[in-house]
A protein has these predicted regions:
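Mixed-charge, low-complexity segments
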Residues: 274-298
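Intrinsically disordered, low-complexity, compositionally biased regions/tails
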Residues: 33, 245, 283-286
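Preferential activation on post-signal-peptide N-terminal prodomains/segments
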Residues: 1-141, 147-148, 152-153, 160-162, ...
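Segments that shape or occlude catalytic/ligand-binding pockets
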Residues: 89-276, 297-298
Length: 298
């Protein structure tokens, strides 16, 4: 491991954050998204979000890497051919459908769960998988006068679980709501869809220990920050699960990874550094560079 202050401490702290991990884990094959299936799912999602159309017809345009669907004057949606990911955005000004007051976490979370169920999010993934609510955010804005920011939107994220393991990467799904409970935007970024034919077990390798993975993370971080020894590194979390690549990138396997988030503090900036290392040894351990090397500030 390259010499770097805190490297050994960093590895120990990360390893202690991992919690229990299984002794072995399934490497799963993924079905290549078919363009026709991406379009069908996208159009079905648009209709579920839009509700009654008053006779308006969908307009669909297929590009090399994506399919775009419009409901004129209502919404725009995009489906990505490489991954099957989808986004839907309603044509609603941000100043409309605002909350008069904040109803609290429990009510907002309930609204988001209900909206997800109503548009059929759980049915998008295979029956043996789960799409579980993960986190609530509030989108707020303040007026010209010095007043408490108003709650504009409630935003919830959902996490896809495959064989009881979370699939990390971007949020598996997000739902944004206005005060009426209507969806204002939506995203779905799961790698497995109901009926897509994927999910076959390719292998069942042994899982690396958290200590082994943490040492690799520390070594990578030490290499990335070589020459910047005054930088302070603080581990935020260290998790085990599957990893989904970006929505514009194809992916043939779900393989296990350890993923670390590290707070980076220097004299000039504070940022977060995310590193993923393989969760198993052998041919199912691709190397990923999720974050570019840090920029040195003179």
């Amino acid at each position: 491991m390259p010499a770097f202050p805190y490297a050994d401490d960093l590895a120990e702290e990360l390893a202690s954050m991992a919690g229990e991990v299984p002794a072995t884990v399934s490497v799963l094959g993924l079905a290549a998204p078919e363009q026709s299936a991406v379009q069908r799912r996208l159009e079905e999602l648009v209709l579920a979000v839009a509700g009654p159309r008053d006779g308006a017809s969908l307009e669909t345009v297929t590009h090399q890497d994506r399919t775009t669907v419009w409901l004129p004057g209502r919404l725009r949606a995009v489906g990505f051919h490489a991954s099957g990911s989808m986004t839907v955005h309603l044509d609603m000004p941000p100043s409309e459908d605002l909350f008069e007051n904040d109803p609290g976490d429990a009510e907002l979370t309930g609204m988001l769960r209900a909206a997800g169920d109503q548009i059929g999010l759980p049915s998008l993934v295979p029956a043996e998988d789960e799409l579980l609510f993960e986190r609530l955010w509030r989108v707020k804005a303040a007026g010209e006068r010095r007043t408490e920011p108003s709650l504009c939107r409630a935003l919830g994220s959902f996490r896809h679980y495959v064989r009881d393991l979370p699939v990390y990467g971007r949020a598996s799904s997000t739902v944004e709501l206005g005060a009426s409970g209507g969806v204002t935007s939506l995203s779905v970024s799961t790698r497995r869809f109901a009926g897509d034919g994927g999910g076959a077990r390719v292998a069942e390798p042994e899982v690396r220990t958290p200590a082994q993975a943490a040492r690799e993370v520390a070594a990578r971080v030490a290499e990335s920050f070589a020459g910047m020894e005054d930088t302070r590194l603080t581990p935020q979390w260290f998790r085990f699960g599957y990893l989904s690549l970006g929505r514009r990138r194809p992916q043939t396997l779900l393989t296990p990874f350890y993923i670390a988030s590290i707070r980076v503090q220097s004299e000039t900036e504070v940022s977060a550094h995310v590193t993923a290392v393989p969760g198993c040894a052998g041919r199912f351990s691709p190397t990923l560079n999720l974050v570019p090397k840090p920029r040195r500030v003179a």
